[in-house]
Amino acid sequence: MTPVEAQSRIAELRAQVARHDELYHRRAQPQIGDFEYDALKRELAELEAAWPQFARGASPTEQVGDDRTEGFQVYRHRERMMSLDNTYSETELREFHDRLVRELERDGLKFVIEPKIDGLAVSITYEKGKLVRAVTRGNGIEGDDITTNALTIKSLPRELKRADGVPLPAVIEIRGEVFLTTEEFLRINRQREEAGEPLYANPRNLAAGTIKQLDPREVAQRKLEVVLYGRGYVEPASALPETQAQFHGWVKAWGLPTVERFWTATGADEIWAAVQELDALRDTFAYATDGAVVKLDAVPLQRRAGSTSKSPRWAMAYKFAPDRAETQLRAITVQVGRTGVLTPVAELDPVQLAGTTVSRATLHNRDEIARKDIRVGDFVYVEKAGEIIPAVIGVNPARRAPECVPYVFPEKCPECGTAVVQLEGEVAVRCPNFSCPVQVRRRVQHFASKACVDIEGMGEAMVDVLVEKGWVHSVPDIYQLKRENLLTLGKSVEKSTDKLLEAIEASKRAELWRFIHGLGIPHAGAAAAKDLARTFGGLERLASARYEDFIREKASVIGGIGETMALAILAYFAEPRNRAVVDELVRVGVQPVVPNSGSALAGKTFVLTGTLPTLTRDEATAQIEAAGGKVSSGVSKKTSYVLAGEEAGSKLEKARALAVPVIDEAEFLRLLSGG
């Protein structure tokens, strides 16, 4: 490489890394994977080392990625919040160990190995045991104050527990990661899929975008979690732990959520064995892990090892190489969702990926196909996005055949032929035809599903037939099906026809929240539907609601319903065809069961823990909700009762600590009966 080429490449790489830093840290919308990003930074660092005359000025290789965004107050960390050096190489990990042994002149150094959580880095400050501030890493010197949003995280205590033998510092910055569990991420994506909305790519991006919402009510809709494992400023200094392993014990004793497991190791071989064991177990963790963090255990030795301007020299992240595969893209099919969103899907030659056979993968949307220049016939790289959803992340241009031409996204709906539209500010392309057969099928399937009014016998196959025959054009048509028509669907169908009609008739008396959920209002899932049912008590009242019924003086009137959801509900019922569906449901005799506002359980919040003698958790939940109560996942001072069975866990301990009434099944049934 000539000097001119080196200077040009350094400038090009600096611009690329800066752009990807902006997309990842500030917008939570990365366009490349960690592996590609780390490769760019590594190439830049190597060139800057080889050509120092062209490496003047601030380099992204020496800076912490900056996550500060508009709309938040900035707060200065009392102790700099660094990022970690990382590697994908076993050799480099062993060299890290050997360097510390050499520099500290110590054999037998002890290390702690922790899961590397794929979330958003945060620093939580406690003063005299009370939570006073939560701040993002920002640029390492100062970050965004997200205290109000962090307080919506149910697992994050506002006050530290006091424990025998464990000091409680006057001031401590405790560092960790905010994340979404895999279960919660999949729940949110299921809701979006039902609504025909584009799926989120991975839990990390969604968690980062959520914690930076300006409205904490919106943050509370997604069940963020936090795990804490590090420390910043500690006052007094005498309250510092002697080792990292000891600090983990303190974090747990204070009642804070910490890593599920960590390893200790002496020597490079033991470190590598622990990393491999962690890799084998990472699918069992509640959070996404993309590597292992190796830390020198002794805190005094950490201080001796010191740090660079960006990273501690006593820690390193070993990142697991992404599980990816190369295969050929045979076709692109476009699916139409319940709300008309067109989602492109890659049809692939089957390939093994993360222990499963993958033959289909998401292409996200029209813009992503164009940006990556993905063409039918290309050899593409497929990766599990966030270890969960298969996605096409790029193309192998070296294997592109001359006949592979740029993909042209459909200008008409592939199902009904209607010209597609793209609303301003949206990446989604939609079919605007409300009568599009696929949209009708998806809406009816959703309404009749177990999650909604639960019409037994009306599965996907039956709905397909009803729509194809022209007997069902919208949800209310379900209640006007004629027996004589259904009897024409085959021989000996009298019994199944009568059972279906009985199930349809019975569904007219389903719980109100099930009807609300069945309407498919954007952003309003089952939990929101239950809140709306308790508040409005009827479909017509909900359909006629005004903004002031949801938001008053910039505050939410209904628990769990923030401004974004309120506006989505109002927009839904402002559409004449949606309002007509409600009117028609009432006309055909639907009479939803309304939560009992006069019950002793009305307005009460329950938390369930352990195994009850006779009731399943679902049965107890259904009875509470039918009586106007609410079931929550976490215990707080606002909890009315904890319903506890055998083998009750930490929720029972927390209830006792907060003096929340604890009842058994017998007492619960007495409350339910009004006794």
Swiss-Prot record:
Q: Which HAMAP family match?
A: DNA_ligase_A (MF_01588)
**Family the UniProt entry places it in:** Belongs to the NAD-dependent DNA ligase family. LigA subfamily.
Q: Per its UniProt record, what InterPro entries does this chain match?
A: BRCT_dom, BRCT_dom_sf, DisA/LigA_HHH, DNA_ligase, DNA_ligase_AS, DNA_ligase_CS, DNAligase_adenylation, DNAligase_N
Please give the cofactor(s) recorded in the UniProt entry for this protein. Answer: Mg(2+); Mn(2+)
Stored PANTHER family: CHROMOSOME TRANSMISSION FIDELITY FACTOR 18 (PTHR23389), DNA LIGASE (PTHR23389:SF9)
Instruction: Name a single GO cellular component.
Output: cytosol
Q: What is this protein called?
A: DNA ligase 1
Q: Name one GO molecular function term.
A: DNA ligase (NAD+) activity
Task performed by this protein: DNA ligase that catalyzes the formation of phosphodiester linkages between 5'-phosphoryl and 3'-hydroxyl groups in double-stranded DNA using NAD as a coenzyme and as the energy source for the reaction. It is essential for DNA replication and repair of damaged DNA.
Q: Which gene encodes it?
A: ligA1
The BRCT domain is annotated at 596-675
Coiled-coil region(s): none
This enzyme catalyses: NAD(+) + (deoxyribonucleotide)n-3'-hydroxyl + 5'-phospho-(deoxyribonucleotide)m = (deoxyribonucleotide)n+m + AMP + beta-nicotinamide D-nucleotide
